[in-house]
Amino acid sequence: MKKIIIMVLTILTISEIVMADMCFHKIIITKVCDGDTIKGIVDGKEVPIRLTGIDCYETSKINRAYKQAYLNKISIEEVVKRGIQSKRILCKFLENRPNVKVKFTDTDRYDRKVGILYADNININEYMLQQGGCLVYEYKQ
């Protein structure tokens, strides 16, 4: 009886590990659009991915950048400068890291997948926050 219980617990543990790993998708990064958006090949298709929980400054003078400047009381030039810096931080971090995975959490109103990126078991979304490359963002559909 004891052996059966141990075997059942072992099987349950292994299936939990397998199921958890199934939530993650291997991704080949094809483009870093900015500090919080990338493109990558997942399951044979290139998809745009928005990193969940973070919002980086824009890298060009688009309408959203002017809004960021106004809300944060900084110049549009400073917004773009910080946006470019965020993009560089993400590019540098991803350099020479072939084992990148993504865990999808949603799809946004622009039809981008929303998710958490991991490289070498490091949560890249959190890393970007720690580096000061972005602000906390609560995703709204």
Which positions does each model-derived feature cover?
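Small beta-barrel nucleic-acid-binding modules, primarily SNase/OB-fold domains
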Residues: I5-V8, E16-Q141
